[in-house]
């Protein structure tokens, strides 16, 4: 897809906006001004837990109980597609369509909505309509996509809450492809809009657009980032840092697309398929003609940016990337024109009217073969970006490109599946996919699990299985740790992981260091024996290992609460199934291996971020609130869930008993804390006798150090909070155990 890098735009510092308001302080608004110093300004090293409080119902305009999935099911999808097809050629004078067709524009919009996804932490992607908000709406690479969304507004307005912006942007890309003769693989609805920018996504360390401080060494890109520069979706089309070196650009392409979960064939298919359509825009030098991005524009622009002073400011005079030209002879039709031109000409370096580095056929070849986008009397030669030439000269991409050129149907199939993957990668498992256009064929990247094909266990079965689990010789610690390891692999970002599928018994999860493979190898056979014995009783009733792992954890929590004097029933709902190794993409799952899990007091050495920061990041991926995170850490410590049976943070003389001892002893003023000789480890000494009472990590001590977390800890340390703590822990535990149970959400919605 066209990468509209605004390489020549004056680079504003993110956050520096034109203040069009009267700067005289109003007595009402004086304390809400953006310029006021925040706590983060005063104490930049303070742990930020705000990411655990984002997307609150208080910022959601939808009514209480609103269920987008149910609303989408009532949508007339055929009517939406019909309206989108009409829009494709309904050129508007305020933003005329290139070649009379908006298709390429909407493909770019959908691509850039989805293309922010990165596998490192699962964040980014098209799943929540974030392109509407800062910073994405003002990224240089998203130049003029504000107009694409405004073109879609009448359709969004027509269908209202039945159709989210997130779904509409992807669907518009699909319909655009279909309207130009391409057969897509499918489309799923189900992306629910957010109503504020997500604060948990780390876009990079840079303080200005198009900077690249994210690199170290020769060209080592910081994890989990995917793009090469701040404000780009993926790579610089002119080449690394604007240097027109196709071989070097191929290195960037391979790394960036791999971090978007794409292999070499998918990468070639996506670039070539996207560049079969449309053109780039560089009618003039951006710094001379183009105004501020949407977030920096004046209030009268009403959320639009990049106002262009050249000529009409649109159409023939459009300026976006600084690159100028089309790749094919028919930019609004699916064909093999991209490869025809890539291999049909020898290419030489030239400059666009804006001064950007790009390529043109040597010796004037190809002259007048490409129509002008707005003037039928004009013709042009085709163009290629440096990153397009990479697909020809790279020793891996080159043969793939040649094969696709010689086998057009193979190319079409590859692009269809790669586009589907690109636009659906962050949607999670198939139960979240909605609508009549969903393909029946599951893809391995969707982490498929088998459908339930047996009768589920009832309450009496559950009670009997709990008794067997507790009498199996496995400890409370082992049962809790195994259930947590399985369930906490979930990522709310791209909805991957979780206990369903019991992939903790498969490669690679069974070998992850954090899961203590030797210990896991002792626990799983015991659970498998209990499962086998139950399922061998005959009849249709069975239990999966995935269900049994979670049931074991629930039984252990109940037992630990009982030992602490509290009778509690931990909710358990069967219905999980066991995935196969064949349906588990090892490479894709490998990137999910935790480098830290503060809930288990695990932190790999050499991590650039402090342990407490990684705890908050983990909690956010688990969709936990700060109080839920607090309750879980305190409970898991006394239950003995620490990695390697470490005693750090186990502030109790009654291990494997669910008590509030962690909080009581952490806040005990008879203790004084000091660093120990070990890195990242602290010790509590009695103020009177000076003997060591406890040891702790930074994750443990943050609940006494951070003022807000300490406030939560104080709640649970109070004398009247013992029962409250147990119930809060059970509620948070149950939430984590069921994070991947989208089937339960569907049943709940159907019941309502």
UniProtKB/Swiss-Prot annotation:
PTM annotation, UniProt: Formation of the three residue Trp-Tyr-Met cross-link is important for the catalase, but not the peroxidase activity of the enzyme.
UniProt cross-references to InterPro entries, sorted A to Z: Catalase_peroxidase, Haem_peroxidase, Haem_peroxidase_sf, Peroxidases_AS, Peroxidases_heam-ligand_BS
GO annotation, biological process: cellular response to hydrogen peroxide; hydrogen peroxide catabolic process
Keyword Translocase assigned: no
Cross-link (Tryptophyl-tyrosyl-methioninium (Trp-Tyr) (with M-260)): 111-234
Cofactor annotation comment: Binds 1 heme b (iron(II)-protoporphyrin IX) group per dimer.
Reaction it catalyzes: H2O2 + AH2 = A + 2 H2O; 2 H2O2 = O2 + 2 H2O
GO molecular function: catalase activity; heme binding; metal ion binding
Region (Disordered): 1-20
Highest taxon, organism lineage: Bacteria
Record key words, sorted: Heme, Hydrogen peroxide, Iron, Metal-binding, Oxidoreductase, Peroxidase
Cofactor(s) this protein requires: heme b
Family to which this protein belongs: Belongs to the peroxidase family. Peroxidase/catalase subfamily.
Subunit structure: Homodimer or homotetramer.
HAMAP family for this protein: Catal_peroxid
Its biological purpose: Bifunctional enzyme with both catalase and broad-spectrum peroxidase activity.
Protein name as catalogued: Catalase-peroxidase
């Amino acid at each position: 897809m066209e990468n509209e890098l605004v390489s020549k735009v004056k680079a504003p510092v993110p956050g520096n906006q034109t203040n069009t308001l009267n700067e005289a302080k109003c007595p009402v608004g004086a304390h809400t001004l953006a310029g006021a110093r925040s706590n983060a300004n005063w104490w930049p090293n303070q742990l930020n837990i705000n990411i655990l409080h984002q997307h609150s119902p208080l910022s959601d305009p939808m009514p209480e109980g609103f269920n987008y999935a149910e609303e989408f099911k009532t949508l007339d999808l055929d009517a939406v597609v019909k309206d989108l097809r009409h829009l494709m050629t309904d050129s508007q004078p305020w933003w005329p369509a290139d070649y009379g067709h908006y298709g390429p524009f909407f493909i770019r919009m959908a691509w850039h909505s989805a293309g922010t996804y990165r596998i490192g932490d699962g964040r980014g992607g098209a799943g929540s309509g974030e392109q509407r908000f800062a910073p994405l709406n003002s990224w240089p690479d998203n130049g003029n996509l504000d107009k694409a969304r405004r073109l879609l507004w009448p359709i969004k307005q027509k269908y209202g809450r039945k159709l989210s912006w997130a779904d509409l942007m992807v669907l518009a890309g699909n319909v655009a492809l279909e309207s130009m003769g391409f057969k897509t693989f499918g489309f799923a609805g189900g992306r629910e809009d957010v109503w504020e920018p997500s604060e948990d996504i780390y876009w990079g360390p840079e303080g200005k657009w198009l900077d690249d401080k994210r690199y170290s060494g020769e060209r080592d890109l910081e994890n989990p980032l995917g793009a090469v520069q701040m404000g780009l979706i993926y790579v610089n089309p002119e080449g690394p840092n604007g240097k027109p070196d196709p071989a070097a650009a191929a290195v960037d392409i391979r790394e960036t697309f791999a971090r978007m979960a794409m292999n070499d064939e998918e990468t070639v298919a996506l670039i070539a398929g996207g560049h079969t359509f449309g053109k780039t825009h560089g009618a003039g030098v951006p710094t001379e003609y183009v105004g501020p991005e949407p977030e920096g524009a004046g209030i009268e622009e009403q959320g639009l940016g990049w106002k262009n002073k050249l000529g009409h400011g649109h159409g023939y005079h459009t300026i976006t990337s600084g690159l100028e030209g089309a790749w094919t002879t028919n930019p609004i039709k699916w064909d093999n024109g991209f490869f025809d031109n890539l291999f049909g000409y020898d290419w030489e370096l030239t400059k666009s009217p804006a001064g950007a580095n790009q390529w043109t056929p040597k010796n004037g070849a190809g002259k007048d073969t490409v129509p002008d986008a707005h003037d039928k009397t004009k013709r042009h030669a085709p163009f290629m970006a440096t990153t397009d030439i990479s697909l020809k000269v790279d020793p891996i991409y080159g043969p793939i490109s040649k094969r696709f050129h010689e086998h057009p149907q193979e190319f079409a199939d590859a692009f269809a599946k790669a586009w589907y993957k690109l636009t659906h990668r962050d949607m999670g498992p198939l139960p979240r996919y909605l609508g009549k256009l969903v393909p029946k064929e599951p893809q391995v990247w969707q982490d498929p699990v088998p459908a339930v094909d047996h009768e589920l266990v009832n309450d009496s079965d559950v009670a009997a299985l709990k008794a067997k689990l507790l009498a199996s010789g496995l400890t409370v610690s082992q049962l809790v740790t195994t259930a947590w390891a399985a369930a906490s692999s979930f990522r709310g970002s791209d909805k991957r992981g979780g206990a369903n599928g019991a992939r903790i018994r498969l490669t690679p999860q069974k070998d992850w260091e954090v899961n203590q493979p030797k210990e896991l190898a002792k626990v799983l056979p015991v659970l498998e024996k209990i499962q086998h014995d139950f399922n061998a009783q005959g009849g249709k009733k069975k239990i999966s290992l995935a269900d049994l792992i979670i049931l074991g954890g629930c039984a252990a929590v109940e037992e630990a609460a009982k030992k602490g004097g509290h009778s509690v029933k931990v909710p358990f709902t069967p219905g999980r199934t066991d995935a196969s190794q064949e349906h588990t993409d090892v490479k894709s799952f490998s990137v999910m291996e935790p480098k830290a899990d503060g809930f288990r007091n695990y932190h790999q050495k050499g991590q650039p971020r402090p342990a407490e920061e990684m705890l908050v990041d983990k909690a956010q991926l688990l969709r936990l609130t700060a109080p839920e995170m607090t309750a879980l850490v305190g409970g898991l410590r006394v239950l003995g869930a620490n990695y390697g049976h470490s005693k750090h943070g186990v502030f109790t003389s009654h291990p494997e008993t669910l008590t509030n001892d962690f909080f009581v002893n952490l806040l005990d003023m008879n203790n004084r804390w000091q660093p120990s000789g070990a890195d990242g480890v602290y010790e509590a000494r009695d103020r009177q006798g000076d003997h060591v009472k406890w040891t702790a990590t930074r994750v443990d001590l943050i609940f006494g150090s951070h003022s807000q977390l300490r406030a939560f800890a104080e709640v649970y340390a109070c004398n009247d909070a013992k029962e409250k703590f147990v119930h809060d822990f059970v509620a948070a535990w149950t939430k984590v155990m069921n994070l991947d149970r989208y089937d339960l959400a569907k049943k709940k919605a159907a019941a309502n």
